[in-house]
Each structure stands twice: as structure tokens, then as C-alpha cells.
UniProtKB/Swiss-Prot annotation:
One BP annotation, GO: positive regulation of locomotion involved in locomotory behavior
InterPro entries per UniProt: WD40/YVTN_repeat-like_dom_sf, WD40_repeat_dom_sf, WD40_rpt, WD_repeat_creC_regulators
Gene: wdr-20
Region annotation (Disordered) ranges: 103-122, 531-608, 684-749
Compositionally biased residues, Low complexity: 570-582, 724-733
Official protein name in the record: WD repeat-containing protein 20 homolog
Domain of life, source organism: Eukaryota
Length: 768
């Protein structure tokens, strides 16, 4: 039987003994796959504010089953993992519906019951169409498929057989997507999608009545860019501008008001006629030659390697931060097109970033397995966090658990600086960083709702009195190790002069011996220039003076060498040679740090000034121990408040909602975790006939007559009947995305194939 399943055994030596060994080996492989060993994952986890509970009725997954081919459970599970790994990264995006009160959960309950009562009516009729239009929307991609569903947080009752929109692409896969929050209205929205072959598409997944559905293609012929899309964003405050980053390290700015077909090659094999508009340290901005407006309007070349992610600060979009494969976090003034600050990862590339609600901090994560918190105003690393055992794939600030001005005033605590101070500092850039000792003005964290003030009134207090280490920020992180970690950033951690051990932090002990210089941070930064807009060096004496004031011990005349150990390797930062350059603008010498030592050479004055612009501050930040990449002992190493295994496959998504937390893994399962006091499990509705969650073993009831999209770039099916491939409803601009070498015809999934894929049930799911 095993030979029939795995194929005939191959004789290595031509004897029966070899054939027997091969058969035994095949059987052993089969048994190892059929009995996989998996760690238990958690259905709930506890923090200081309460218990977060899994919401089985609000789970999403791919409705389509795996290929119809009978395999043992272990083999099937392994095949599912391979199929998921072969596709693009699973991403989740949300469209916020109409504003609704969240003061009392009872106000939302009738909505859920009304939907539950009418969702099984013939032909999927729903009486409360107004409520359906006002509900939030969730979009996620799994492999070559894209789905859009209604989402109500902890009140969601998932029916995977009836998506709002569903698309399958042939020859390419969605890699990233984002809703246009600025232009969304009842019954209409814009969803921007990026693909592995570099194309971009804007669709309206809510439009069902029009005979010519809205669809717009950018970079259709791959003339502008041929690599995969890594991240896309809509410009805050502008419903027409969106940006897309690529594996090539390019970031393009598009304008919907300009024709999407204006950048076609028209049969020419020549590259696009870009011209440099502005250039700085490791970045350049290009525009089109001539006065004719084209899409994309500008191109940013940033760093070396792929731009993994970028994000804007707050709702005004004044600053833009990027993280790249070269390990750099770069912060730009987007409108002025100036580089404001940089930071280097401890090791490897950076994969993700997140702005704090007040735009004063940035959290990053990547291949060094560390969480890094960076202060934008002070341009320094606040702390690092170690808990993950693999790459950190997503970090997010929780806007509902960040302390507001009102909370701090009630607790008798004053904050340090405002976003206006940060923006003013970056817009002027004509002097040293202003002092951050001013009191807080009004309007700091508008993103924080009443949830943190009402439900978590005692979050920063002990028996009604202000806590000593007041929690200012809550950060979440997920990684390839399948763990979800929550971190608290306290007031003490934000104090630059306070390097003592915190209650929730510790300095990691060394493991491997490495001989480096352990002189003070002042000595390491003395001969380094500061990052300035456009790459020009400025006098850093003010920063050096401020750092000197924070250290009471004088710099020793002779540096002493000590041996300490490290947990993470950084051999790429060390070298057997040393060099130095001089700054032609400010006249300061730039000592390159090699093995922790600062070296100044008189011969550097004779270097070509043209080379200095190429090996300026970005090369300096590669050196471990500098201001831009502090050593392991230079900043506090904190521990997480909570770290739990919540998935069997690597996690790729983390989103904080008002009543829940959303995670997603590469297998394509989107899970909802109800916040404390916002969800109570109900056993009678978890496995209800109308609920088709991935955890349940029952098939959904009701009709499967939901309209199915034409897959590729085609329109949605009309009257529930998908058009044929030869239908005239497909226009030339709605052709399917595919590789030029692919000749197979497009296909679409019929209604019969919308059956629910049954996720294997594990022991933890039946636990109380």
C-alpha cells in the first residue's frame, strides 16, 4: 500500500535487501508525516488588564478545499503547509465602517442577532441592508486568492461560503492590499492590490449592480517595474495618491487623477526616461523627463535591497519611515523630500515598523529577532526587546492602550514633548534638537478612544494612585516562531539618563566571547557626524554636549578592554581594517568604528570629496557601537509582558482593533482575540449550523448563491451567473495578470467549489 501511495521503491544496490531498506524508509517517512508533533497553542492569554480570549466564530480562512486527493491526515497537513509556503505572504487589511457607539456592548448585540436571524433565508436575503453596509470589511489573501468579508469584531458570525467578493488570479499572486479610507462610502470603496509580478490594481469589491465594474490597472505591461510589490499605502489626507514599494528597492508614487496608461512603453525596449530630482545619503528621487505628467509621478530609490515596509506618521503624513533589507530604518520628511534620521538594526535586515499614535516613537523588528524602539525626536534607540526565537514579521503599537494626556494629568504625570515639537524640529532642522522637558500641550493622541480610559481606568494606577513606572505605550509583535508578544514601554525607559534595570526589562547575559572596546557612549559618538536632511553633515556638538551632561563619569584617558559575550552575532559589523573620512561641510572628522574602536586618520583629509558623499553617515551606521547602532550594553534589553504561542505556522499579521486583536498565519487562518470584558464565549453559537469557522467541523448551511467574481481582472458575476471566457463584458484593460510565458487560459471557480475547507481539529480546541 505504501508503494502505491509513494511510488515504487528504488533499489540502490540492486538487491532485495536494498529494496527492503527502501520500503522501510518509505514507511518510516510516512509514519513521521502521519504523526506530526505540534506544540499546544493557546486559546487565551492573560495580561495586566485582563484575559484575551479566542473568538472561534470570528475566524476566517480559505473557503476552498485543498485538491481533491485522499491523503492521511499528517500528509495532508504537510501538503497544506507547503502550498501555503509556496504562495505569497498572507496579509490582512480593514475598511472601517460608519461610526458607531462602543460604550456598551448591548448596542452591538442586536446587530449580530438580526444578522444571525436573516442570514439563512432563501437566496441569502438580508433584511438589514443598512447595517450590512455600515459594517467593517476585512480583506485577506491566501496564495492566488483574495477574499472580502464583513467584519464585526467579537460579534462576527463567519460564513465562509458567502464572501462579499472573491477573486482568483492566474499567473500571479496578491502580495499586499489596502483600502482607501478617505474615499470610502456606503456601498462603494477602493481596494488597492499589489502583485508578485509588479502590477497594481484598484477595484471596488462592494460594487455589484454595475454592468462595468470599476477596475484600474497600473504597470500592466511591467514597463515601470518587474519585481514583486512588498508594501502599498494610501497617502493620509489624500484620496488620490498612493505609494507602492518593491523588492528592487524602489518606491513609486501614483496619482489617480493621471491616466493609468500614460507610462506604457509603446513597444519600446528602452528603460523609462527618469531624471534625478533630488539626491541624498543612500536615497534618490527621480521624476519624468519633460513636462507631460505620467504615472508614477515620482520614484524613490532608497537604500540597498528590498524595501520591506514603509509607513506614514499619524493622519497628516508629514513623515515617512521605511525599513529595508540592508537593515536601516530611514525617516523622511515626505513633503520636503529630506532624510531626517537613520537607525541600523543589530543584525540583518529590518522587516517591519510601526509609528506610535503620537508619532514620537517607532518600533521595528526583523532578522535579528529583536524588537527595537526608536525615539524620533531624540534620534536614539530607546530599548531593545528579546523574546522571539525567529524573525519578527510584524510589530504594532496598540493605540487603545497608549496613555493619553488626560490619563497622565489625572495620575499627576506630565509628558515630555508633543508631536508639534517633533514636526517643528524636523521642518526647521537649523539647530540642535530642542529640549524635551516642556509640558504637554493639547491634542496629543487623538487615536486613543474611551476604551483605554474607561475599561482600563486602572491600567496605570495601583489602588487609585499613580504607578511609579507609568506605562506609556503598548507594543505587540509576532514572528516566524508563531509567538505573539506584548511589550510595555514605561516612563523610565523613555528617560535617556536612566539605564538602570526596569521591572519588565533586563540586560541579556553574554554567551560568546568577543573582545571590543567598552568605552562610554560619549567616546564612541565624539567623532561621528549627525544625520542631516539631504545627506549634509552638521555640527553635532550640541548632541554630544547633551549626552555628556547625562554622564557624570569623565572619559578615561586610556581605554580599557573588557571581554563580554553576545547573544546575537554581528560579524558583518567587524573588520580587520579601519578607515576615516572628513566632512567637507562642517570640517569634522568621521572616525570609522572597527571592532568598537574609534580611529581618526590624517590621511582622510586628502580623500576625494566626491567619495565622501557616497560613504557618509550610512556607512558609519554599519558599525556596531555607534549612535545609530548601539551595542548590546548601550541600551536596555527588555522582556515582554506576555509571550504565547498562538499558531502552528509562522505569523504574518497583527492588528489592534477597538474590541479585539487580530492575528494571521501563513496557512491562511485569521484569528480574532477578544479584549478583556469585550467577549464572553458562548458554547451554543460556536458550532452553530450557520457558522463556518475554520475550527468547526460542520458545513455551513444556506444557499451558496453569493455572486462570484470573474477571476483575473474581470468584472463580478451578474445575477449570480459568472460570464464565460468569451463574454464581451471583459475589456482590454481587464485582462488577467499573468506571466508572459504562461499560455494557459484563465479560469474561475464555480459556486460548487465554495465549500468550506475543514481545518484539522487539535486537542487544544476541545480544552476548556
Amino acid at each position: 500500500m505504501h508503494q502505491h501511495m509513494l511510488g515504487p521503491s528504488t533499489s540502490l544496490g540492486g538487491t532485495n535487501n536494498s529494496a527492503l531498506q527502501s520500503s522501510v524508509l518509505s514507511e518510516g517517512v510516512l509514519l513521521s508525516h502521519s504523526q506530526p508533533t505540534r506544540e499546544e497553542i493557546k486559546k487565551n492569554f492573560e495580561t495586566r488588564e485582563g484575559v484575551y480570549r479566542s473568538v472561534p466564530s470570528a475566524e476566517f480562512s480559505r473557503p476552498r478545499p485543498l485538491p481533491q486527493y485522499h491523503m492521511p491526515p499528517g500528509i495532508a497537513s504537510a501538503a497544506a503547509s507547503q502550498i501555503a509556503a509556496a504562495g505569497s505572504t498572507v496579509r490582512v487589511s480593514f475598511l472601517n465602517g460608519a461610526e458607531k457607539s462602543v460604550e456598551s456592548p448591548e448596542a452591538v448585540a442586536p446587530t449580530s442577532s438580526t444578522y444571525e436571524h436573516h442570514k439563512n433565508e432563501p437566496n441569502g436575503a438580508r433584511i438589514d441592508m443598512v447595517d450590512e453596509a455600515q459594517a467593517d470589511k476585512i480583506c485577506f489573501n491566501v496564495g492566488k486568492e483574495l477574499y472580502v468579508f464583513s467584519y464585526r469584531g467579537t460579534q462576527t458570525e463567519t460564513d465562509l461560503s458567502r464572501p462579499i467578493d472573491k477573486r482568483v488570479y492566474k499567473g500571479t499572486s496578491p502580495t499586499y492590499h489596502a483600502f482607501n479610507q478617505e474615499s470610502a462610502k456606503n456601498g462603494s470603496c477602493q481596494l488597492l492590490i499589489g502583485f508578485t509580478l509588479g502590477q497594481l490594481q484598484i477595484i471596488d469589491p462592494l460594487e455589484k449592480s454595475s454592468s462595468s465594474p470599476f477596475s484600474r490597472l497600473y504597470n500592466e505591461d511591467r514597463y515601470i517595474e518587474k519585481t514583486s510589490v512588498t508594501c502599498i499605502r494610501w497617502l493620509p489626507g489624500d484620496s488620490n495618491i498612493f505609494l507602492a514599494s518593491y523588492v528592487s528597492g524602489n518606491l513609486y508614487v501614483y496619482d489617480q487623477r493621471i491616466s493609468a496608461a500614460s507610462s506604457n512603453n509603446n513597444g519600446s525596449s528602452q528603460p523609462p526616461p527618469w531624471t534625478i530630482h533630488k539626491e541624498g545619503d543612500k536615497f534618490a528621487i527621480h521624476t519624468w523627463k519633460g513636462k507631460v505628467q505620467r504615472n508614477p509621478v515620482t520614484r524613490w530609490q532608497i537604500g540597498e535591497g528590498s524595501i520591506h515596509q514603509f509607513s506614514f506618521s499619524g493622519s497628516d503624513g508629514k513623515m515617512m519611515a521605511t525599513v529595508s533589507h540592508d537593515g536601516f530604518l530611514r525617516i523622511f520628511n515626505y513633503h520636503a523630500q529630506e532624510l531626517l534620521a537613520v537607525m541600523k538594526s543589530y543584525f540583518g535586515g529590518l522587516l517591519t515598523l510601526s509609528w506610535s499614535p503620537d508619532a514620537k516613537l517607532i518600533a521595528t523588528g526583523g532578522e535579528d529577532d529583536l524588537l527595537t524602539v526608536y525615539s524620533v525626536a531624540e534620534k536614539r534607540v530607546v530599548c531593545r526587546g528579546q523574546a522571539h526565537k525567529s524573525w519578527v514579521s510584524q510589530v504594532k503599537f496598540d493605540p487603545y492602550l497608549c496613555t493619553t494626556e488626560e490619563d497622565l494629568e489625572n495620575n499627576g504625570i506630565a509628558m515630555t514633548s508633543t508631536f508639534d515639537d517633533v514636526a517643528k524640529d524636523f521642518s526647521i532642522r537649523s539647530g540642535p534638537v530642542p529640549s524635551t522637558s516642556a509640558d504637554l500641550n493639547s491634542g496629543v493622541m487623538n487615536a486613543t478612544s474611551t476604551f483605554s480610559r474607561c475599561s482600563l481606568a486602572s491600567f496605570n494606577t495601583i489602588n487609585g494612585a499613580p504607578a511609579g513606572n507609568s506605562v506609556r505605550y503598548r507594543i505587540g509583535s509576532v514572528g516566524h516562531d508563531t509567538f505573539l508578544c506584548l511589550w510595555d514601554i514605561t516612563e523610565d525607559m523613555l528617560n535617556q539618563g536612566n539605564i538602570r534595570r526596569h521591572r519588565n526589562s533586563t540586560i541579556i547575559a553574554p554567551m560568546t566571547t568577543l573582545e571590543v572596546q567598552t568605552n562610554s557612549l560619549v567616546g564612541r559618538l565624539e567623532d561621528l557626524q549627525e544625520v542631516s536632511p539631504g545627506g549634509a553633515g552638521v555640527n553635532a556638538s550640541s548632541d554630544s554636549q547633551s549626552i555628556t551632561n547625562n554622564h557624570t563619569t569623565p572619559r578615561p584617558e586610556k581605554q580599557k578592554k573588557k571581554k563580554f559575550t553576545k547573544r546575537l552575532g554581528f560579524s558583518k559589523f567587524t573588520s580587520g581594517s579601519s578607515s576615516a573620512t572628513s566632512n567637507p561641510v562642517g570640517g569634522h572628522k568621521i572616525g570609522t568604528l572597527m571592532n568598537g574602536a574609534s580611529v581618526n586618520s590624517e590621511s582622510s583629509k586628502k580623500q576625494n570629496p566626491g567619495l565622501i558623499s557616497q560613504i557618509s553617515c550610512c556607512n558609519e551606521t554599519r558599525m556596531l557601537g555607534s549612535k545609530f547602532c548601539p551595542g548590546i550594553r548601550d541600551v536596555p534589553m527588555i522582556e515582554p509582558l506576555m509571550c504565547k504561542k498562538v499558531s502552528h505556522d509562522r505569523l504574518t499579521v497583527l492588528e489592534f482593533r477597538e474590541d479585539c486583536v487580530v492575528t494571521a498565519c501563513q496557512e491562511g487562518y485569521i484569528c480574532t482575540w477578544g479584549r478583556p470584558g469585550r467577549y464572553q464565549p458562548k458554547r451554543d453559537c460556536i458550532n452553530s449550523p450557520g457558522t463556518a469557522s475554520p475550527e468547526s467541523g460542520q458545513k455551513p448551511s444556506g444557499s451558496t448563491s453569493a455572486m462570484t467574481s470573474s477571476y483575473g481582472y474581470g468584472s463580478d458575476a451578474l445575477n449570480g451567473v459568472p460570464p464565460s471566457r468569451s463574454s464581451s463584458t471583459y475589456s482590454n484593460s481587464e485582462q488577467q495578470l499573468r506571466s508572459p510565458n504562461i499560455t494557459s487560459p484563465s479560469y474561475r471557480v464555480s459556486a460548487a467549489s465554495t465549500s468550506v475547507y475543514h481545518r484539522p481539529t487539535y486537542a487544544w480546541q476541545n480544552a476548556n
